[in-house]
Amino acid sequence: MTSLDDTIISYQNIMLLDNMTNYNKPAIDYFHHEFNDASLEISASWTLLLKMRKHKLLRLPSCSSEDVLDYNMYLVRLHHCLWRRWSINHYGLQNSKSNPLSINWNKETDVTVLYGPDLTNIDSNENEISPVQNQIDQKQTKNLKSALKKNTECWVTEEVDEINASIESNDNALVKLEDISCPSSVDSHTSSIFDQHSTCTKISSIDEDSEDLMNEKKEQFPRKLKFNQAVMKREIDSKGTIRESLININDIQHSRHHRRHHRRHHHHHHQNSSHSDETIKEAHYEFSNYTFGTMEEDIFYRNQVVF
């Protein structure tokens, strides 16, 4: 820190700047000034002098700041004077002082007064201003709390309205979910884990506040899953010919003899089982929008697999 511009803007630094620029501010005698021990004025002044010994930021009444040696020597004298007075007060040595009349003073060299900057009012003024500032801060805090309280009440009211609206919309969504959800396959000969307690996964996004209500609603309306009877299978050979076939995936109950001789009596099975043909034709109609072209019926029957 080489100039006043490098200092941090604080109350203490402003007071030091005032001491540097305000020539009407009186100096004090460090030998005889009555420092307040309760507010630790000696220790506070000593600390400031210790910080300022490397910087010419104090206006000393008996020397020039342009003379570096004189300025430093004077500052050291002020610092040592405060240190001695602080030690006397700390150890209770007031009665151990020498009688000034018993000393043979040399008027040419001995100094009986030592004037320096008044650094005691820096902390005292700050303490006097702080209660007023605290009152202002308390008023601002009260106003802030009241404003926050009003805003919080308005916010809570708006949130309650939004939650009620979301609950009503969720009730309507549950009705739509009844149409979206599909029952499980009635042809299944084994029980499925999806039949009793599962729900349809096509649920629109809802607010977190009404998530518990939605879970209760879904428990009241258990839904089942539905699977297609068959899936489309496309094959492309090396010549680019496209062949489509339907594979029956529904777990229709068949006899063991039928499953054992399925491949041997493949064509005979289609002649005698019209129900299976109708089921596959319905599934083929569902996938007609995804075909690459018109396929002949003989290709369809030749490539189908039923199990």
Swiss-Prot record:
UniProt feature, compositional bias: Basic residues: 255-272
GO BP of this protein: cellular response to glucose starvation; protein catabolic process in the vacuole
Segments passing through the bilayer: none
InterPro entries: Glucose_repression_reg (IPR052292)
Disordered, as annotated region: 254-278
Source domain of life: Eukaryota
One Gene Ontology cellular component annotation held by this UniProt entry: vacuole
Alphabetical list of PANTHER family matching this protein: PROTEIN MTL1-RELATED
Additional information: Present with 1960 molecules/cell in log phase SD medium.
Entry's family note: To yeast YOR062c.
Protein's name in the database: Uncharacterized protein YKR075C
